[in-house]
Amino acid sequence: MLEINDFNAIRISLASPEDIRSWSHGEVTKPETINYRTLKPERDGLFCERIFGPTKDWECFCGKYKRVRYKGVVCDKCGVEVTRSKVRRERMGHINLASPVSHIWFVKGTPSRLGLLLDISPRNLERVLYFASYIIVEVKEDMLQVAREMIQEEYAARRQKIQKQAEEKRIELSTQLTQDLGGMETAQRSTQRQIEEEYRRLRDEIASEAEQLRERLEELSGTLADEDILFRGVTVVEEGEPINENTLDQLDELVEQELEVLEERRRRDLADAELLTDAERERKAYEATQEQERLQERLQRELDHLMREEKEKLEQLDTLKVGRIITETEYRQLRDIAPGVFRADMGAGAVRELIEKTVNLDKLAEELQAEIQSSQGQRRKKATKRLRVVEAFRKSGNRPEWMILTVLPVIPPDLRPMVQLDGGRFATSDLNDLYRRVINRNNRLKRLIELNAPEIIVRNEKRMLQEAVDALIDNGRRGRAVSGKGKHRLKSLSDMLKGKQGRFRQNLLGKRVDYSGRSVIVVGPNLQLHQCGLPKKMALELFKPFVMRRLVERGVAHNIKNAKRAVERVRPEVWDALEEVIKDYLVLLNRAPSLHRLSIQAFEAKLIEGSAIQLHPLVCAAFNADFDGDQMAVHVPLSRKAQEEARTRMLSKYNLLSPAHGEPIITPSQDIVLGCYYLTMVRDGAKGSGKRFSSIDEAMLAYEKHLLDIQAPIWIRMTGTLSGKSDRPVRELPLAADGTPRMLIETTIGRILLNNELQPPLRFRNRLIDKKGLKEIIADCYQYYTNLRNLSEDQLNEVRASHGNKHVQELARIYGSEMTAQQADRIKALGFRYATLGGMTIGIEDIEVPAKKYDIVREAEQLVADVEKQFRRGLITEEERYQEVVRIWQEATKQTIQAVKENLNPFGPVAMMSTSGARGNINQISQMAGMRGLMSDPTGRIIELPIKANFREGLSVLDYFVSTHGGRKGLADTALRTADAGYLTRRLVDVAQDVIITIEDCGTEEGLWLHGADDDELMEKLQVRMLGRILAAPIYHKETGELIADRNTEIDEELATAILASGQESVFVRSPLSCQAEHGLCRLCYGRNLATGKLVEIGEAVGIIAAQSIGEPGTQLTLRTFHTGGVASADDITQGLPRVQEIFEARVPKGKALLAEIDGVVQIVRDEEGVRTIRIVSTDVYTDEYPLGRGFSPTINHESEVYEGQVIAEGPGGAQIVTRLTGKAFIQGDRIIVSQEDHQERELVVPHNARIRVENGERVMAGQQLTDGSANPQELLELQGREAVQRYLVNEAQKVYRSQGVNINDKHIEVIVRQMLRRVRIEDPGDTGLLPGELIDSAEFRRLNNDIVSQGGDPATAATMLLGITKASLNTDSFLAAASFQETTRVLTDAAIQGKVDYLRGLKENVVIGKLIPAGTGIEKRIERPHEDLIGEMARMLEESQQAEEAPAETRRATPLPTPNGNKAPESDNDALLRARLEELLSGDGDNDQSDAEEEDNDLPAF
């Protein structure tokens, strides 16, 4: 039947506003949810029935229309469509946003997709979106020019004005100076006049005084002076001297002198006055000049300032580019400078407008391509990142502006329910709170815009709306997370998807299922291997519907309702019905944790009393179950196909071998082993020892008459051969009459009893059977009966009768499994019986302390005392003392163990339990009877003080305290290890989940060389490693050269023996590592399925098996990165689980080893400070020979230096010989030899604690390890290539597991390593259209290159990438698988932008969308049916449809056919549709149409 779910790919992309509106059934405009009085949804609210559909089936909101007959009617009163209420799980609504908002995934992701597209840094983008900065969205170029001219004109006018003002000031200053100078001239003349007048007055005074004195002297002439006569203070005549003519002359002289002095003073005063005037004049002139200069400077300053201002404004105009981000201040300035020239805005609306106006994807792609070609380094890296986003948009058909939301979808109400609690309060999904915030803010914003509110208020409301939408989509991604009541962070849509509790992991990959139950398990020793005991009460509940149906069929109840009542009342008839229903019905048993596929197996249910599930003891190993309170879950496979699959594939008796290593996992253990060991022991001297019997029957008779002990050695004559070696004497006897070999063997009754229970081909085993021996019996039984050569036609027909006509290999597998299951059950019964009869148990008396122990301890104490003495004397260091003490006590512990071993009674229960492998080992017995020995402290360092006591003697308080360290560490270690191993398994499953066997043969010629085990005892023998592989090349006998086996032959046990016998030490086999299958693997590269021992079938999910095989034993690995002790190697060597993680995550290992970077010779150099350096010197010599023809002579000297292109010889007619090398030339007779040395050196500094592995002068190869430690796989890949790193990873992982005694087949690790190396990084894209640095699947890369080469283009080049499993999982082609693994939001963001198509090739993606997985029986549906089959089916459907039309109305049932748009087509159109499709197919057009449609639109379901 064609189904609407029958599509083969799913696509994710960005939703356009139109898409969101088309999904929606109405706009949500109110934040209300439900009315608290009526408890009915509010109209236009988040739960509105008009938008999302009715809350009750077939009933509208107001109750006008009730019942199904009104189906599809839309109520004219309340507007609700009458339909089923489940539409509320699928109908969406929408909110028209008052202002666009950005989608936070595309803004805040790393890298920010929106930021890359617009070439804006995430910080700036955030500032714009959250209204802190403006972004220019429009610049009017014509207005810009006008603005520029206006600015220039304005500044020119301002300059003119300033210059004019300065000129006026200059004139004013000049006039002032002229006036000042004129005034000074006048003042100077006035001063001169005053001086002249003053001196004239003084002269007159002197003349007047002289005249008066003369007159007096003339009066007194001829007399003696009676006193001194003075003239102006100068004596003219002294007292007593005569006054005469001379006296008058003297007076004239004095007058003359006085007048001269006066004249002198007058001249000086005039000169001083003139000088002062000149100085004042100069001062005034200087001040005027200074003022002029200041004026000039001020003018220049103002002009410069104007120039700068003008330049700045013009520059600001020049920077007015669309997309420029400006602050509030800058915006205001620019608005003032150039009003109306540009438009800047804030928020998501601005960004959306910018995208619509400026982003031309094609043009941008071309520009970025050119930049990648022309630039280097960081610029090129950025351009590549941007181009990746641009190309994603171009190829996907998404529009960049859809990253900004204008319409917000509202998810269906039943996905964000609101439920009433007991107290009348309501519990609601966080999403309702988040939606309510968005609606409130949106409505408020609408109102503010209508009211023309101030810009700042509107802007704030827009920012709050943006934040509300951010919180709804991904709460807490930016800023503080929105919290609800009680500080609890609200769960957003992103939180609904991601993490362990998210939609992917909680609901899509991990659904809870109906028809299941769980209970405690107890052992069911009487069950057969394929049975389990199911408590009746549990079975009745699980099979309730089946029982009810059976009661109605048998007439016990009239209808289902009565039957239900009968079952609930548990009437006696119910048990009979249950017995009938459950007969041959299979149930699945599962024990958590389900670490591998054997954790879920199918069993036939046997009804039992009680409440515990009974489990067969032999399947405990597969489930890792014990009976100390473990619980198991039961599941009922319902459909016929599920039952069939459970029977053919999951039944416990068909799961005998472990998929991890191919050995039996159904291995007897504990009591069974002990019983069989007890049976096959030989006790010399027991009752009847040495007796001889003519046959087995005779010996058994003697045993039954109690004449023999079960363990007594007796001689028996028997026919046939021995299986394997005997541990007792055997004597050959003459052949019997029919040619059968006969012998006389020494054996015991116990061994006869055991062999009686073995299948005839496995007899006669005459040796002590321990756990290993029982495992061999099971393995031999399976191998014998699954080998077609050993089966008769009758045996195969027997299987055919019960299992249908299958392939003979499959029949052999089924027969072998059933025979082995029978064998296991018989051994189980025998083991339990004789463990009981033997009565072996442990008591305190069985633990005997050996007498030797005390001597050993005393001796050790003496040795320790000697060491202490040496230390005190300073002969040894503290570290040496510690090492020696630890060594002494370790040796003492070893000797004690040996003493305990020797002291044990081999027939005692303790020794039997230990040596048989039933329980316990010699170390544990030694702790009870010997000494406990050394313990570790919390850091893992050994405490040098041992516990000398044992548990039999009892521990002292100190002993007990010291041993608690180790105990506690052990518990903590186990808890942590379990979580780590679980996470490792999850990552492994994720990386390999799409590795499925998809094709028969990929045809590759490549393969893997398997070599014989070298000195590494951890590696397995070649015979074991090549078993189940397929030869990649023919193999020949080493000496004779004859063909042993051709290519593509499976290496089975016989062929493996033949290959080794031929002397071959290595084989070239196919491997998952070299498989060329485009998806998954091919059968031949994988080889044998270890769980069946046969070649793997198509559809086997080998990736999951590999992951489980590696992850399941993870808990057995240690967590420690432990100390090797000693100074020689002080580095910690990572081992156990951390080392496995290191390998699979391809991390740089702890204690990394140095690798040689080139081939060459080692020189170890040590400098003065003791730092060691390894120098590798590589010298390659190239020679070129030039014969000298007749007439040629050299133009160079012997041993002279020459360079490439130099003429080294000349001949007749100007002929020349030119050298191709640069080096030294040697002339040897009639030829010239040019030799060139290519010299390379590498230096590596050795860490101080590293041990060097190489010697001075040793020759090393590139990639060779130079120091101890682990190699970095990334370096190894670079130096030695892909094959070397594959080999290294597989071997290193195996070393860790083997060191812990865990056996895993190589091919499982190879599958994981293949996935780690699946991707290549593009270096040069050629003509492929890929991007440099892009990671792409290697198969896809090969396909693209082949296509390009066939079209004559340039192929791309790429480098192999080694990715850790986490990174490889996230780089898978399936976005559903990657999103359900980790980083959900990032994966979905990328996938949406790229418009990714998931072709549903892996398992996870199919589980997520609810399809059958493409593995096992599920792959049969995927293998395309031929064209004719499809036509046949169409024709049959058409015929059925016509018959249905002709049938009476009451018997006719409508079978609507799905139409491509997902709606049901009307019944009457059925045959028209079918007929049209059939005609298309018959005309041969149908296929073409379909393929075209698929090419055009990958997300349409294939019809």
From Swiss-Prot:
Its cofactor is Mg(2+); Zn(2+). It is an enzyme of class 2 (transferase). One of its GO terms (cellular component) is DNA-directed RNA polymerase complex. Gene3D superfamilies: 1.10.132.30, 1.10.150.390, 1.10.1790.20, 1.10.40.90, 2.40.40.20, 2.40.50.100, RNA polymerase II, clamp domain, RNA polymerase Rpb1, domain 3. GO terms for molecular function: DNA binding; DNA-directed RNA polymerase activity; magnesium ion binding; zinc ion binding. Residues 1486-1503 have a biased composition (Acidic residues). Its EC number is 2.7.7.6. It comes from the Bacteria. One of its GO terms (biological process) is DNA-templated transcription. Pfam families: RNA_pol_Rpb1_1, RNA_pol_Rpb1_2, RNA_pol_Rpb1_3, RNA_pol_Rpb1_4, RNA_pol_Rpb1_5. Zn(2+) 2 binds at C1002, C1075, C1082, C1085. Residues 1439-1503 are annotated as: Disordered. Binds 1 Mg(2+) ion per subunit. Binds 2 Zn(2+) ions per subunit. Keywords: DNA-directed RNA polymerase, Magnesium, Metal-binding, Nucleotidyltransferase, Transcription, Transferase, Zinc. Zn(2+) 1 binds at C60, C62, C75, C78. SMART domains: RPOLA_N (SM00663). It catalyses: RNA(n) + a ribonucleoside 5'-triphosphate = RNA(n+1) + diphosphate. InterPro entries: DNA-dir_RpoC_beta_prime (IPR045867), DNA-dir_RpoC_beta_prime_bact (IPR012754), RNA_pol_asu (IPR000722), RNA_pol_N (IPR006592), RNA_pol_Rpb1_1 (IPR007080), RNA_pol_Rpb1_3 (IPR007066), RNA_pol_Rpb1_3_sf (IPR042102), RNA_pol_Rpb1_4 (IPR007083). The keyword Nucleotidyltransferase applies. Mg(2+) binds at D626, D628, D630. Belongs to the RNA polymerase beta' chain family. The RNAP catalytic core consists of 2 alpha, 1 beta, 1 beta' and 1 omega subunit. When a sigma factor is associated with the core the holoenzyme is formed, which can initiate transcription. DNA-dependent RNA polymerase catalyzes the transcription of DNA into RNA using the four ribonucleoside triphosphates as substrates. This is DNA-directed RNA polymerase subunit beta'. The gene is rpoC.
